[in-house]
Amino acid sequence: MKSKIKNGEYKIFKTLVQLTPQMCKELKSYAKKHSESIFNPDYNRLQTPINNTHFFYTIFEDALIKTGVTRGRIINDMVLLYSKKGCKKQAYHYDYDPDKVTNNIRRKPCGVLFAIEDNTKLNILGEGEVYLNQGDCLVFEGDCVHAGSAYNYDNVRLHTYLDVIDIKRSENSTWFY
């Protein structure tokens, strides 16, 4: 299914990848074993990089390419995110400089969230918590204001960026709303 994303919005691709129980087990185990704490009000949100030699990288990359959203965009900085039970919600933010992500650019950069487990979620300003089931993929434009959700249970999910040549994303930086 190929589609375009509206400005500043998001699109959910239902069951982008059909995960096997073994794939889920390996991804969750890898995330829990290798993750380090990241930007969050507590130390319960962690991440670990997924490079192109990891078994899941090509599976996910191929599925994402088939949607058409990667056209004119470059997949970068793929990570597994691991939220421990009790993880607090992040502050609302942009992943890209909002002064650079405008309607005047040819193609906007995007963020991507892929659910390895049911009840994966992301807070989107004006929408609240947007839930994903296992295998669902949420693609959101760089000017979509969002926040990592609070979790009262452990959750592992994949996150990556779809960068564009016109806008340089600062690694590990956010712009608060």
Where are these regions (language model features)?
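Intrinsically disordered, low-complexity regions enriched in small/polar residues
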Residues: I12-T15, K32, P41, R45, ...
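Non-heme Fe(II)/2-oxoglutarate
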Residues: M1-G72, M78, K89
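Catalytic core of non-heme Fe(II) oxygenases with the double-stranded beta-helix
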Residues: N76, S83-A150, N155-L158, I165-Y177
